[in-house]
Amino acid sequence: VREIIRKASGETLDLKAYEADMRHLIDTYIEADASRPISPFDNMSLLDLIVKSGIANAINSQLGGLKGNKDAVAETIENNVRSKIIREHLTDPAFYEKMSALLDEIIAARKAKSIEYEAYLSQIAALAAKVHAGQAEDTPKTLNTPGRRALYNNLNQNEALAIEIDEVVKTTRPDGWRGVQAREQVIKAALYGVLQDEAEVERIFLIIKQQPEY
């Protein structure tokens, strides 16, 4: 039961916006007895399981307590996808804003019953895979690190510019630069040499700061 609640909440998502729905889900569909392992995949996150074994197996393995209630299953999956988007948003705002908009469209279609449930599951599974991977399927192969991909997505998909900035940052960054103003200014100065725009420097710097590879 605890595990089902954790999956439904997306682990770290602030559920204030969903409290009424989640309370109904918990009160109606989850018994208050001791939890027990459901499958060998029980320690895997719901999104991991959707990507690695398919959405049908993920539902059967981790959402057994909601079996028979399609809306509850759908909302649980949606909450987990939304949670991932919120957690990763600052690392690549453009990509995750796009993913958030796609999620909103899928949710709206489900609630309006404008698509069959099987089609809904296919769409949400495809979106979950993109969110889990942190990149679109058509991303150029030269953008072979999360940092490069984030720069590409937030620079109007300018591949050459993304690679140039990636290389500039990696060749000019001082050790231990995060949180040290003088060292951060070294990187900003290097960025200005490429971008020639102070506002753009500040915007891109915030993304770079969120990327561990830099």
Predicted features, each with a name:
Residues 1-214:
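Catalytic cores and motor modules of nucleic-acid processing enzymes
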